[in-house]
């Protein structure tokens, strides 16, 4: 199975070269880097976390540098576009997508905190008119009501379900801890909550 690494912003350009070569050597299939600058902040935190995008030129330079550092043609660099998170337009996201693909990005990830998913749908459909082959990646955390079949009909190739397995495990962990505390032993917890 392919393994995709979350590379955050990719760091400084000179560090991204090292990251690409290291990931390739480890057998990782792809890295996703986001077009933000500054310290790492979750894109879904809302308006309290200010998202600052890199310039198109700066991010294209990072993509080109990463592609030039690759040893094999198999490794993919996927550009994550934060325009919709930052409150910018779909047109801005599309302009960035076109520039990033031109710079060598092997895929485009579009991100949004809009619960309807309408902006993602419009982006994907408009991007597909101009570019039929570049993979589109989405993370449908906030628009979780949309099915994979619908996403595929928009032109989406990959859906990432970010930390859903971990988040679903918390409920069982809390119940397990409560059982141990209530029973002053683990026997009941093992029988009920453990595999």
Stretches found by the model and what they are:
Residues 164-195:
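Extended, intrinsically disordered, low-complexity segments
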